[in-house]
Amino acid sequence: MAKIVNKYPVGIQTFEEIREKGYLYVDKTKYIVDFREKGMKYIFLSRPRRFGKSLFASTLQAYFEGRKELFEGLAIAEYEKEWVKHPVLHFDMSGAKHFDADGLNNYLNLQLLPYEKLYGKGEGEIYPNERLDGIVKRAYEQTGEKAVVIIDEYDAPLLDVVHEKENLQPLRRIMQNFYSPLKKLDPYLEFTFITGITKFSQLSIFSELNNLDNISLFDQYSAICGISKTELTTQMKPDIEAMGEALNMTYEECLNELTQFYDGYHFSENSEDIFNPFSLVKAMNAGKIAPYWFGSGTPSFLLKLLDKYHVNLSTLESQETVLSSFDQSTEEMTEALPLLYQSGYLTIKKYEPMFQEYTLGIPNKEVRDGLLNLLIPHYVNPRRSDNNAFLLGFCKAVYRNDIEAALEHMRTYMATIPYDLENHSEKHYQTIFYLMFSFLNIYIRTEVKSAIGRADAVMHMPDTIYVFELKVDKSADEALAQIDEKGYMLPYHAEGKRLIKIGISFDSTQRTISDWKIKEE
């Protein structure tokens, strides 16, 4: 059996350790060359959690510290000749979660202390902003070189309270105060790099640093974090072959499975395909494809967000929108879309330049399945002992194309859903319908546009396409008639598959399916 060739840095985010201990490093140093050649001085990068931001920040630290030996054989080794050693202040804010104001001030104190030991502390420097200001100036005076400031996960202290106004305000004031010296420190700074998940416009980073380059949506930086398809198939090809052999798959089958699970991220209009690096590295190291990123902990703010905005998973599969709707500051959010995109639960699927229209969607199977598991308890009883029995019977019926039996299973099951989980709206029934089919990894879409309307749901099977119309307290015949009247079947006539239309009637009193009609085109 083939062995894994590379040594994978599971849980390691320090560039120095990766290079010194011989772990696989996917070279991203060409982006540092790009920054330096363009004279870029203040940079902000937004990427989802566990997506390689901290490793890139660590790489920048090693570069500006002049650690030439760590970069041997990498792209930047051909560019850099001088390797000037700058004083580097690297603040990791990822540990500042779930703090109140006192806890956050204590955390900032611990972040500043090591640099005050190095460069001293001035009299009268009490508050974090005063201390940061003094450290940068003394570092410059003592070394003769301008300082570099790296702030990793700058928004971590605020994300968990983003929708709790009374808790957010004091924490935001503390962070605003801490970041406030950066603008006036310009003469003492060589470079500033800030990472995060989202944008808090009222922090001084964005309101005062008017020369800040936000590279998060630029094509040329789409692969700055994460692993591109090219990087995967060149640097990890032997290991994909070894994994495939262990899983009784060909190389192509294994690559396709990795792609389905972890690929699909796009961070700009013309972005490369980007794989989730956390999951990919874990999978390659373990030799097993599993939901590592989603399973590593769903942030509490996401659960609050889904609840606050009553997020319907079926609408997330394809969201047509404009840039300002998802690339906006957290304080200005009136819907879940921006934070779902910035957190990695949605990504750019398509861009239409004529209308400057973006289509956002769920990036891959790992995220899709994770969201399904997260949302299903909102619509069904999570403690039902017969959930698995229902899903098994439902699954078998669907895969043998016995829609009659599948709907009978669904009718029986839905009648037992607790009353307090029901709201009787057509959207609610549509969501339950969608979730049950999606849980089986069947390709189903809701609200699918045709020339003069939207089909409630379209399900694609290997040899058959099903078009569904759902009605509440109306007849199945009415639902079937609407499919014909609105031309919902027309887009699929050229696909060469069986076309079946299904009208379904839900009874809000009985809280389940009351009738259905099935007709083949």
Question: What label would you give each PLM region?
Answer:
Residues 169-173, 472-489:
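Mg2+/Mn2+-dependent nuclease catalytic core
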Residues 148, 464-466, 500:
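Structural motif
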Residues 1-425, 440:
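Phosphate-binding site recognition
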Residues 433, 455-472, 486:
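Conserved catalytic cores of phosphodiester-cleaving nucleases, focusing on short active-site segments
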Residues 451-455, 497:
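Short beta-strand or tight-loop elements
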Residues 436-450:
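A short acidic/basic microdomain associated with nuclease active sites
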Residues 491, 495-521:
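Domain-level recognition of nuclease-like catalytic cores that cleave nucleotide substrates
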